[in-house]
Amino acid sequence: MSEFVERLKEYIKENNLSVTALAKKIGVTRETASHIVNEAHMPSTQAFIALVEYFNCSADYLLGRIDIPQSDSFDSVKPIGEILRKCLKDNDKKETDLQNDLNISSSLTYKWLHDKSTPTIINYIKLADYFDCSIDYLLGREQ
């Protein structure tokens, strides 16, 4: 079982939620919630954000990237564009570096930088590793 699913199940148990109740809390169908809990697939970015906001937990902790749950309060999620531009600038990188180094298409990075779409959870992980930052930082939840 993945670290993500183990931790998600812990939060579900701590909050006495059924899969149906979880689905309602995060705005997905019962079937989708069941697939997430049973590792059939990762949640969409929107559903993942709903999970971390509902449980008020660190995205990095829920994904198993850090071992200590943070109990801080988090800011609301912000669009990726401004944050990604700051990461590129702070790391002296260009958009083309990001595309080449992570094998990500120019159309995708354009959409992220202009807030036309959000990265998948897998791409958030790649970006966090690339910029050596937390996923919570990329989500705008921490400064």
Enumerate the language-model features and the residues they cover.
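A short, Lys/Arg-rich alpha-helix, primarily the initiator
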Residues: 1-17, 69-93
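Conserved hydrophobic/aromatic packing and binding residues within compact polymer-binding modules
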Residues: 8, 22-23, 33, 62, ...
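Short, structured motif recognition centered on aromatic/hydrophobic residues
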Residues: 8, 45, 84, 95, ...
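The alpha-helix within a helix-turn-helix
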Residues: 12, 23, 52, 88, ...
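DNA major-groove recognition helix of helix-turn-helix
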Residues: 12, 37, 47, 55, ...
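Recognition helix of helix-turn-helix/homeodomain-like DNA-binding domains
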Residues: 27-42, 103-119, 141
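DNA major-groove recognition helix of helix-turn-helix/homeodomain DNA-binding modules
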Residues: 46-61, 122-137
